[in-house]
Amino acid sequence: IGAAGIDGAGASTLKDDVFAAVAYCPINNLGNADAGYEWEYGAVRSDANTPALGGVAYSAGAQKAASAEIAATFPAYLDGLGLGVTSSTLAAAVTAQLKEEIERQIAKGTAVPQLGGSFTTARATLPNDWLTLTGTGTSAKVANIDYGKFVAYVAANQQLKSVVAFDAVGVTGNPNISGETNLFGSAASRYANFTAWSWNHNTVAGDASGQDDTGQDWAAYTASSSNTLARQIKLINPIAYLNTSADAAPYWYVRHGMVDRDTAFAMQETLYQAIKKDPSVKDVSFKLPYLVGHSGNYDVQEAFAWIKAKLDANP
């Protein structure tokens, strides 16, 4: 901020209050994002929609077993948050968001295909085998959404991330250092694994990450005061601060495209539920925009109208 933000004694003269947050496909809660991704997509993964790693197909290598192991950790995590949505109701909560968005589009005159018709996105034209409508024209309503088939449709529209989706380095044959893994580490390391599964399965010798190099499993390493990894993970996770004594921004505008597979719907719904429950939050606008992929600023008029309305209400 510089000199303009401090007084003569060096103390800050600026507030750090955040009035509102506007977020498009927020990649959030990285410590649990892999678990949410595999919980969401593991059942529909195949060689057709999941990249091979090191020339080894999804079904033939380590990815398939890893997906199942990682997915199995998500229900206990979600259920332990106490948000009111659980692993047994999460799919229904996302389905309700889909229904709301689709009916909103129909009322605006958007041509939404009947069952057996086709959806066309910027990437593909694929059959509608998951959405059943009743009625016609702008008065049509959603009669049924087959959530499992919807998830498979999203994976067919754009190939999924490989396993592991976020904490990818040094595991399941992935040679690449992900952008997420680069976010963590220390002065002595280029990166650090940031989930228990990837830490405990890292097989790259000499990268200073994982049990193989540190001699400590995930639980022991993150409990140690000799490193800051656990703190780093917490600092970039809004779930760790919502519904606590922290003072959250009062207004939130969150969008995640209806065909965006860059993170799981499970993670965005979890974020939405946490925001909605926080007593500091006055309003949250959350949508899954119709047939939108991984992008932002596609609704500038709507977003700025929302911002203006909040500013006008708080002169």
Language model features with spans:
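Catalytic His-Asp charge-relay segment
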Residues: 20, 249-257
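Well-ordered, non-membrane alpha-helical segments in soluble/globular domains
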Residues: 232-236, 266-273
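Accessory recognition modules or surfaces
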Residues: 231-249, 296-304
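Primarily recognizes the serine-hydrolase "nucleophile elbow" in alpha/beta-hydrolase
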Residues: 1-44, 233
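Long, low-complexity, polar/charged, intrinsically disordered or flexibly structured peripheral segments
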Residues: 92-235
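Surface-exposed acidic, glycine-flexible loop patches that form ligand/cofactor-binding
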Residues: 9-15, 240-247, 310-315
